[in-house]
């Protein structure tokens, strides 16, 4: 993402919109924590993506997420408060549902570039091959 941001977003050539699409409770928790970060939403999402191996698929996801969240300034109390906010969970799930229902998203990552759908991770070279002809 940093290369994509530098090459296209920061230069105004493209817009990037992140839509939350969690497939499991740990991903839901991650996006909830990002939302609780308020003005630091994207910084928290970035940390969560970079630290994914430390909290996805581990024995104690909640404890692992707490450790990652503490790096972002969460306390035990703010962490618990965030993850027990039912309205927040409902809001995250609503975004996921809309993606599935309206845009037929069924995997992550999924990219929409000029109305076309691309599924799966892509290198900056693969993204550039799609984006550059559209500029």
Predicted feature residues:
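Structural alpha/beta surface segment adjacent to cysteine/selenocysteine redox centers
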Residues: 1-70
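C-terminal cap of thioredoxin/glutaredoxin-like
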Residues: 1, 5-6, 66-135
């Amino acid at each position: 993402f940093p290369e994509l941001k530098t090459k296209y977003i920061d230069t105004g050539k493209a817009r990037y919109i992140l839509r939350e699409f969690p497939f499991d409770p740990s991903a839901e928790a991650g996006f909830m924590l990002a939302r609780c970060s308020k003005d630091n939403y994207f910084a928290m999402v970035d940390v969560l993506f970079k630290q994914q191996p430390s909290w996805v698929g581990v024995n104690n996801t909640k404890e692992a997420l707490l450790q990652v969240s503490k790096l972002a300034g969460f306390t035990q109390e703010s962490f618990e408060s965030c993850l027990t906010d039912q309205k927040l969970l409902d809001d995250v799930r609503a975004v996921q549902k809309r993606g599935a229902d309206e845009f037929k998203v069924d995997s992550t990552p999924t990219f929409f570039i000029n109305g076309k759908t691309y599924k799966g991770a892509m290198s900056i070279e693969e993204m550039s091959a799609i984006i550059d002809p559209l500029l």
